[in-house]
Amino acid sequence: VAVQASREVVIEAPPEVILGALADVGSVPSWSSVHKRAEVIDSYPDGRPHHVKVTIRVSGIIDTEVLEYHWGPDWVVWDADRTLQQHAQHVEYTLQRETEDRTRVRFEITLEPSAPIPEFLLNRARRKILYAATEGLRRRVMTTVASNRSM
């Protein structure tokens, strides 16, 4: 049975800065408590990641995934190959500019676990993933914006 979750957050930065933070997959473990390792396997000609290998840990479950990224002007999507812990995973970040320096970010994840997971563990994992994907991203972007302003 597929599990879905989503969350929106407003970040005080333009979409291109947010997409830049998402493209910097090597730094993801520094702002996402879910990610333990992330490495780019190959990239698109523009330098953005195409395939990425990540190790994640959520609610005591550890998994290594190979993600295939697709990029648009205001979105990024990735899908995971089948692993020991899941049959499939689909993630979307959709960005909507509200003002010059303010963007609404919507994060959506659909995951099909390879085995049944108790509801209390699903709820705990859902909260942790949604927080890392939105608030963690916000902290990372705001750090980037602050350091750019001080230059």
Predicted regions and their residues:
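A conserved amphipathic terminal alpha-helix motif
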Residues: 110-151
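Hydrophobic-ligand binding "helix-grip"
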Residues: 29-30, 37, 44, 55-104, ...
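A short glycine-/small-residue-rich loop at the edge of a beta-strand within enzyme catalytic domains
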Residues: 9, 56, 128
